[in-house]
């Protein structure tokens, strides 16, 4: 179960985000369901040459490519076409996680465009 909140706080959407291992454990796929807003799927495959995850997110006629790396306690996914656009798993624990869609400003500050607080249901 997830709560999707737009950065300006104008809208909160209840949804679901399902994760599973696919391709005999070689990849992780997820499906995100945000009713009346967005439905999408992501495929993450570890690249041994770059020591990072190659990521593709597809939704409603569009695909976004990213590269994911661990940075301290966070997992940071950077858009391959725009290094200022990032998706960040800020905090992950056994029961919940916190995700943010951010844009890096010219001064280096992160502008939060949207965030998700998710509770794990097993």
How would you describe each model-predicted region?
Residues 1-122:
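Hydrophobic small-molecule pocket/channel-lining residues, especially in calycin-type beta-barrels
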């Amino acid at each position: 179960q997830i709560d999707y909140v737009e950065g300006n706080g104008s809208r909160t959407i209840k949804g679901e985000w399902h994760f599973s291992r696919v391709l005999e454990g070689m990849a992780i796929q997820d499906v995100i369901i945000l009713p009346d807003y967005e439905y999408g799927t992501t495929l993450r495959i570890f690249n041994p040459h770059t020591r990072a995850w190659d990521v593709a997110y597809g939704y409603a006629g569009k695909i976004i490519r990213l590269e994911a790396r661990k940075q301290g306690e966070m997992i940071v996914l950077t858009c391959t076409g725009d290094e200022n656009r990032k998706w960040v798993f800020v905090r992950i624990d056994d029961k919940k996680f916190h995700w943010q869609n951010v844009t890096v400003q010219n001064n280096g500050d992160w502008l939060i465009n949207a965030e998700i607080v998710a509770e794990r249901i097993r």
